[in-house]
Amino acid sequence: MILDPQQIPDREKLILAGLFLSKFDKVGLGLLGFDTFTEAFNVIGIALGGKPSSIKNYRDEFDPLFPNPRAGWHHRSPRPYCAAVLEEYGDLDIQTFCALIKSFVGYEAKASTQPPKSRDEKESAYARRLLTGLAAERYFESVQPGLSIFKSCAVENTTRLGCGYDFRLRRKAEGEFLAVEVKGLMEMTGGISLTQKEHEVAEALSFRFFLFVVKNFRETPCHEIYRDPLAGPLVFEKKKRIVVQVSWQASA
């Protein structure tokens, strides 16, 4: 059994997500922070670079094998490659399986750089926030070539560079770049937060900074683009949060 996400093929990750949702049903759904299967299909499918319908189809394929209320594809046995995944991973307990699904989208790495917003934020809500953020980034990558405002741009993913935006776009190798910060919302409306770094960069770059908001993961994702968001229709209010850090010291 392979538990290293780097060694698991992309299609197998989609199959495993479907298997997890079929086997653990609404309990598993809740552990990932989702309220409905549709939002889980949308977020996980897009985050893994696949289609939401693929996750649903794999879940339905496994449904007849587990005691959940859905009939699934009861008229036939799982396809050989799905049966092979079931044979290898079907006995995983819910916590181990959930951790595996989270690892597909770099949960541990993101958790180390994007701490919970507050002590009260539950792990499931935290997981959903990170999953939704990655899904929004993948959504942007998929639609960017067809957006006239970013047409013919070379795109660099800067999410791991800590530079205050997620993507750097250039039309010419030596020309000025455009910065795109991507945010994701479950609903059509919701709160959007900028970190201190993101706000500073947005202010400095002005019209070269874009806020790309992916909305409605709960049903059908769509997007809205805000150029120079600090000067546009959005009103940002500064919030301060005090973090208490505890350490233990000893003299040697």
Where are these regions (language model features)?
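Acidic-basic catalytic patches of nuclease active cores, encompassing PD-(D/E)XK
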Residues: D120-C153
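Catalytic cores of nucleic-acid endonucleases
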Residues: V182-A231
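Major-groove recognition helix of helix-turn-helix-like DNA-binding domains
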Residues: L48-F66
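A short acidic/basic microdomain associated with nuclease active sites
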Residues: P145-R170
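Conserved catalytic cores of phosphodiester-cleaving nucleases, focusing on short active-site segments
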Residues: F140, Q144, Y165-L169, L178-M186
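Eukaryotic helical DNA- and histone-tail-recognition domains of regulatory proteins
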Residues: I8-F34
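Interdomain/boundary linker segments immediately adjacent to catalytic/signaling cores
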Residues: H74-L130
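Short, charged amphipathic recognition helices of the HTH superfamily
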Residues: L3, K26-G45
